[in-house]
A protein has these predicted regions:
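Gly/Pro/Ser/Thr-rich low-complexity, intrinsically disordered segments predominantly at protein N-termini
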Residues: 1-182
Length: 182
C-alpha cells in the first residue's frame, strides 16, 4: 500500500476509528479508556504549567519514519503553540519536541508502542518519545535520535520524578498516575 492509498483510506474511516500507517502496515488505534484519557489530561496540565510556550496536542497526525513514509497519531505531540496551523491532516514532524503514548490493553501494544513507534519517531528526528507503560507501571523516556534510533532509553517506575531531557527540559512528578494503573 502506498502512503497516498493509506491517506485515502484514513480519510474515509468512520469518526470513531483512528488509523496509522507504520512500516508499510495499516493499524487501528484502540479508542482510549477513561484512565488513558485522564493520563493525557494530567500530562497536558503538566506541560502547560512547566512550558507555557508549548502545547501538548492530542492525536495530531504526524508524518514519521525515514523518507516520510509513515503516518502516526500519537496520544500527545508537544510542539510550539500554533505549530500545526495551515498544515493538513498529516503534519510534518519538524518542530515537534516530544511525542507521547500511553499503552492500551490490546494485542498490538507491544509491537506498536514499544518497538515500531520509537523507531518511527526517531527516524523522523523527534527529540523525545515518552511512553507511559501501564502494563509495567513505568515511564520510558527515549531520547537523542541517531541514525533512526534513540540512543538513550531510561525506564523509571511511576511514582518517581521523571526528568524529560532537553529540548523539553522539565520534571514530572508521576505519583498522580499510580491511581490510574489498574
Amino acid at each position: 500500500m502506498t502512503v497516498e492509498d493509506f491517506e485515502e483510506l484514513a480519510a474515509g474511516a468512520p469518526e470513531h476509528v483512528s488509523l496509522e500507517f507504520l512500516f508499510g502496515q495499516v493499524g487501528a488505534k484502540v479508542m482510549p479508556d477513561g484512565d488513558h484519557s485522564e493520563m493525557i489530561k494530567w500530562l497536558q496540565r503538566q506541560c502547560m504549567q512547566h512550558r507555557p510556550d508549548l502545547w501538548l496536542y492530542p492525536e495530531a497526525g504526524l508524518v514519521v519514519e525515514a523518507y516520510r513514509k509513515g503516518r502516526a497519531r500519537p496520544d500527545g505531540v508537544l510542539a510550539p503553540d500554533g505549530a500545526f496551523a495551515g498544515q493538513g491532516e498529516w503534519a510534518e514532524a519538524a518542530g515537534v519536541l516530544m511525542t507521547v503514548e500511553v499503552t492500551s490493553f490490546d494485542a498490538d501494544t507491544d509491537g506498536r508502542d514499544r518497538r515500531e513507534k520509537p523507531r518511527a519517531y526517531a527516524e523522523a528526528g523527534i527529540p523525545v518519545y515518552l511512553l507511559i507503560d501501564r502494563s509495567t507501571a513505568e515511564a520510558v523516556i527515549h531520547s537523542e535520535p541517531v541514525k533512526g534510533e534513540y540512543s538513550v532509553e531510561l525506564r523509571l517506575p511511576l511514582g518517581k520524578v521523571v526528568t524529560l531531557p532537553e529540548p523539553v527540559g522539565f520534571d514530572l512528578e508521576t505519583g498522580a498516575l499510580l491511581s490510574l494503573i489498574r
